[in-house]
């Protein structure tokens, strides 16, 4: 077996309009496919950012994920950016709440990378 890379990550959301606005208008993803699946009464939106794909299922009445990091399931998505301070500023200007920038000493081999949660 020789896995080359992760093709996509699939996540669930509950609000079609807010989800699409967040990923497309605020984060800059491109919609590559979008379907309403009548038999399941949900939307499937395939998004692309560079070489990465995100598959979003917008499902009515999906159970909420517990709001603490140790809950099972997807914990976070991480993005590579050129200037983290500028990126955080622009996210905040778009109404996206961010946490303080911090050094991540566990996953980074040098102090050249910062993480904003």
Tell where the protein language model's regions lie, with residue ranges:
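A short, acidic/glycine-rich surface segment
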Residues: 32-34, 42, 56, 61-67, ...
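Vicinal oxygen chelate
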Residues: 1-2, 88-117
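Residue-level marker for the onset of beta-strands and adjacent loop->beta junctions
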Residues: 7, 43, 75, 114-116
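Helix-adjacent hinge/juxtasegments
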Residues: 56-57, 65-81
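Core segments of cupin and vicinal oxygen chelate
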Residues: 11-54, 93
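Short, conserved charged micro-motifs
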Residues: 18, 84-88
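N-terminal beta-strand motif that seeds the catalytic metal site of vicinal oxygen chelate
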Residues: 1-17, 74-79
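Short, charged/polar surface micro-motifs in flexible loops or helix N-caps
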Residues: 50-54, 61-62, 84
């Amino acid at each position: 077996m020789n896995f080359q890379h992760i093709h996509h990550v699939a996540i669930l959301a509950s609000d079609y309009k807010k989800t699409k606005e967040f990923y497309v208008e605020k984060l800059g993803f491109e919609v590559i496919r979008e379907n309403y699946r009548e038999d399941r009464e949900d939307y499937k939106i395939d998004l692309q950012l560079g070489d990465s794909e995100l598959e979003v299922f917008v499902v009515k009445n999906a159970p909420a994920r517990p709001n603490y990091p140790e809950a099972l399931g997807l914990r976070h998505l991480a993005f590579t950016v050129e200037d983290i301070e500028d990126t955080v500023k622009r996210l905040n200007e778009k109404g996206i709440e961010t946490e303080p920038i911090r050094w991540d000493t566990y996953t980074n081999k040098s102090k050249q990378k910062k993480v904003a949660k």
